[in-house]
Each structure stands twice: as structure tokens, then as C-alpha cells.
Amino acid sequence: MTIGIDKIGFATSQYVLKLQDLAETRGIDPEKLSKGLLLKELSIAPLTEDIVTLAASAGNSILTEEEKQEIDMVIVATESGVDQSKAAAVFVHGLLGIQPFARSFEIKEACYGATAALHYAKLHVENSPKSKVLVLASDIARYGVETSGEPTQGAGCVAMLISQNPRVMVFNNDNVAQTRDIMDFWRPNYSTTPFVNGVYSTQQYLDSLKTTWEEYQKRYDCDLNDFEAICFHLPYPKLALKGLKKILDKSLPQEKKDLLQKHFDESIIYSQKVGNIYTGSLFLGLLSLLENSDSLKAGDKIALYSYGSGAVSEFFSVELVEGYEKQLQNNRLDLLDQRQALSVADYERIFFEEANLDESGSATLSGYEGQDYALVEIVDHQRRYSKVEK
């Protein structure tokens, strides 16, 4: 029995901030963002768009009504939780109308969470082969106005349906994970934005890659020639590019180096227009590679490097199956270009707006007409979501 990703899709917010505009407003050389980070645009989520609505939109974009009745597990991987007790997956389960006899829960370990969710989903299908699991990597990266992390914000969700005999890719049994108890990036419960030791986090990302990859090579007796492409966690694409260069073997043929670079460039296309989506960033890169490459084929092995601050990293691989391209979307870039561009002033107002609750802990929200799903009100401190009628 093979297990893997049967369907994969993506959703993001309706608003976009051009980093050229942000750079000019902040008095920054635009090339520090376009070349120094390899970023162009950021998706900006309003108050009515959160990880629940993004996850519902992404999930709905790939699921049929029949599949909603077959799913028996919903996992939301996130570090942008909306409630300290109730899992975002429970909200999403209800919004999508998934059959009631299902497990729904949330997984957290910074940007690594979705990788953990995939492995849990795989184990579930191994034990229950008829099962289907919906994994939703949903996050909003919000650092604050005029902070060092401001150009690496973003919002979005990658949805993946896990099943036996998948139509996109199979998981190979070759993963190596590593844990380090460090403080490179963290967000205490009392803070709405994270604390970041940027230089240290970069060092840890790269060193975790090096050591995890070296252990992977030892365990599975392989090298980069065994892979058609490598996808990386993408807090910003330039860091992943440094990672690629760090593990490129000098003895690797130039033709192979060029191929890995070509596929890397294809893997960052969506992230360059969306920004950082934490748990979803690695898998947005994978989706970008699949939908923008003209040379991938069935049987190709793709390596993936997952990193979550704190820190947990993992190196593993997948293999494309025959007909995988039939499950993909060919107009995603056009859809991203349809987002509404914001001025920097509007971005500051929209992205950092907070609900104005009355004495009972209630607020009625508006302005969500362009969304598929929305947070429409808060009643007695309870978040109320709805599908938006068009």
C-alpha cells in the first residue's frame, strides 16, 4: 500500500502589499527586499480573515462533497491559533460540512507543525487504509509595523488530502528528524507578535539543515543525485537559497547543480508573491514547484527540508505518481494577480486591526464580501464563522 498526497491546494487573502511600496515608505533600498530576501509581495489578511477562514477556503478548493463524507480526521497545523482551548480544526470541520465521526485537532511546533501532521496522517492511514485525512497548514505571519521582520510577513493555507493510492505523490519511508531546545523565535501567550533572534535563527536553520542532511545520507546511503529537486522551508526565499548552496556537493556535476537551481527557482515563485506562511511555507514551495515546472515527471523523487524554530527540523522525500499534473491548477498566478493592492497606510490599518469588543465581549464585523469564508462576529467571546454568500 502506498500513502501520500492525493490532492493539494492553496488559499490566501484578498489583499496584497507590494514590497516596493513598503521599501519606499520605510526609506529602505528596494533591492534589500527584492534581492536580499528574494521577496516581491505579501498577502495581507484583514480582521475577518484568520487561520480558520483560510483553512476552510483551502480545504474547500480541493474537496468534493463525496470526499467530505470520507474524511475521518482533520488536522490544522499552525502557530497562529485563535483559541487557547478549541482547535481551529473543529471550526473548519463544521464550516466544510465534513461527516461528524471524525477526529479534529491542532498541531503546533512553529513552522514544523505541518510536517508532523503529515506523518501523523500517514500513520493513521496505515492503520485504517480506507481513511482520508485533511491536513491544513494555515498561518498568518505578523511581526509589527517598522520591525525587522515586517518584510517577511504573510498569510495563507496549504491544504493536503492524505490517502492510500494517492494521485499526486507518495511518501517515502526515509525521514530523519532532529530536535534542539533553543530560543531563536518564540511568542509568549501574552504577546500578539513574536520575538526573533534573526541572526541566530538563520544560523540554526542552516546548521540544522547540514546536520540533518548528513544524518539522512548516512542512514539511507544517498546523495543529491538521487533527487530531481529539493524544497525548503521558506521564511524568505533567500535563506532557502543559502541552504541549497550549503548542501551542494562540489563534486556534483554542473548539469545537476543547474537542474537543482532551476527547480529551486520554480519552488519560490508563489512565496515571492505571498510571503511567509510559517507551517505552510515548505508545502507552498512544493506546490509552486509542481505547478511551475515543465520538466518534472512521474517517478521523480523530491527532497523536502522542514524547519520549525525552537527547534525541530526534518529531511524526507516524496515521489511523484503517474498523472499527478491532473490534480494541479494552472491559473494560480493569475489569481494572485487579482488581489487588491494596498497602500502602506491601508496595510497598517487592515493588518493590525483588532476587534472592538463591547462589555459582553461581542462585536459585529463587516467588509468580508470578497472572502469565501469569514469571521462575521464575536458573541460573548465566541468566534462565529460563516461561508460568504456570493
What are the language-model segments listed below?
Residues 9-12, 77-82, 109-114, 137-142, ...:
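Acidic, glycine-rich active-site loops and adjacent beta-strand->loop/helix elements
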Residues 32-36, 40-50, 80-132, 249-281:
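Conserved catalytic cysteine-centered active-site region
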Residues 287-336:
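Catalytic phosphate/nucleotide-handling subdomain of diverse soluble enzymes
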Residues 29, 51-66, 88, 204-220, ...:
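Short, well-ordered amphipathic alpha-helical segments that serve as non-catalytic structural scaffolds
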Residues 199-220, 225-248, 270-275:
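A conserved active-site cap/scaffold subdomain adjacent to cofactor or substrate pockets
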